[in-house]
């Protein structure tokens, strides 16, 4: 029986009016921000933080065109992927609440038919993929769904990443012997890691597999987008950009934990980190997210069809 696929991504503001709603949905998610406050206090506190933060974030979106492309890119990917899989593909945008009812209704119409959930995140964390799984389970507890939990170490992902990087170097006439790659993944609070979240281990294995096949290129793994208090995974991308010591002429930042470009690649990497490297006299460039690779859709289809699916209960943080 042909499955229906649920293509899940982060979601992002489609215009400036979406920013506060997006941030509120993100920050009030306990899988993301955690804490021990009662639910009603947690929601009030982080709704307030989102409201205060939104005016500071809107100008960042204005710098990248006034919106995040992640929504439209995910919708476009779903259509193309559907033809590759020869099966229906439904989209889910985790932090765009006004899209949720349509997704839930589409899934309800499937009854007992099998669904395969495909979060577009190479490396599993309870804070992102786990949150997606929890949301679907809470709203559709009887849905016959299993999940592609992660794919960061899948041979097809590794090969696609390597081809994507090498094609970028070739298109910019950058010699492999004279460049350094900073693989930038999203950060994670150490309190998650200390409780057994496998995210950093998966990132390290994925990074090692890619670096092994790029022996002539200097590579570093780092983590970006720290938010709030407490210790996060290190080294931070920003600190690496400030302190990097290499004799290579070119330094490229590769979005590693992101399959789609969005505010954290188009603004944080492009406008902040690249600027630091340029100020330090490096020839610095951002490599587009793997979504831009012409091989990505076929690679993703292969990953989906060759992965052992996981049941929801092992993916939700208790």
Swiss-Prot record:
Fe cation binds at residues 186, 264. One of its GO terms (biological process) is heme biosynthetic process. It holds the Pfam family Ferrochelatase. CDD domains: Ferrochelatase_C, Ferrochelatase_N. Its EC number is 4.98.1.1. It comes from the Bacteria. SUPFAM superfamilies: Chelatase. Keywords: Cytoplasm, Heme biosynthesis, Iron, Lyase, Metal-binding, Porphyrin biosynthesis. The keyword Metal-binding applies. The keyword Lyase applies. GO terms for molecular function: ferrochelatase activity; metal ion binding. Belongs to the ferrochelatase family. NCBIfam families: hemH (TIGR00109). This is Ferrochelatase. It comes from Chlamydia abortus (strain DSM 27085 / S26/3). The gene is hemH.
């Amino acid at each position: 029986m042909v499955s229906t696929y649920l293509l899940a991504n982060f979601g992002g503001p489609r215009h400036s009016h979406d920013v506060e709603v997006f941030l509120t949905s993100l920050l009030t998610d306990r899988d993301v921000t955690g804490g021990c406050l009662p639910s009603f206090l947690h929601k009030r506190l982080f709704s307030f933080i989102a409201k205060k933060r939104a005016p500071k974030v809107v100008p960042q979106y204005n710098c990248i065109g006034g919106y995040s492309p992640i929504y439209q890119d995910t919708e476009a990917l779903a259509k193309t992927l559907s033809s590759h899989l020869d099966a229906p593909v439904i989209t889910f945008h985790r932090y765009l609440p006004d899209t949720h009812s349509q997704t839930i209704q589409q899934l309800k119409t499937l009854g007992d038919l099998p669904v395969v959930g495909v979060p577009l995140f190479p490396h599993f964390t309870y804070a992102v993929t786990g949150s997606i799984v929890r949301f679907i389970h809470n709203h559709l507890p009887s849905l016959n769904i299993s999940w592609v939990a992660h794919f960061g170490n899948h041979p097809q992902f590794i090969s696609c990443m390597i081809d994507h990087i090498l094609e970028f170097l070739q298109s910019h006439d950058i010699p492999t012997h004279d460049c350094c790659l900073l693989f930038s993944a999203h950060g994670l609070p150490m309190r998650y890691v200390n409780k057994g979240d496998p995210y950093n281990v998966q990132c390290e294995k994925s990074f090692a597999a890619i670096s092994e096949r790029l022996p002539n290129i200097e590579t570093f793994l780092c983590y970006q987008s720290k938010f709030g208090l407490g210790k996060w995974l290190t080294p931070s991308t920003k600190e690496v950009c400030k302190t990097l010591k290499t004799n290579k002429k070119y330094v490229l930042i590769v979005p590693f934990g992101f399959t789609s470009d969005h505010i954290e690649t188009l603004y944080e990497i492009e406008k902040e980190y690249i600027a630091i490297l340029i100020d330090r006299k490096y020839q610095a460039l951002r490599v587009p997210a793997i979504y831009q690779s012409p091989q990505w859709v076929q690679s993703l289809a292969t990953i989906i069809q060759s992965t052992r699916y996981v049941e929801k209960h092992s993916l939700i943080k208790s």
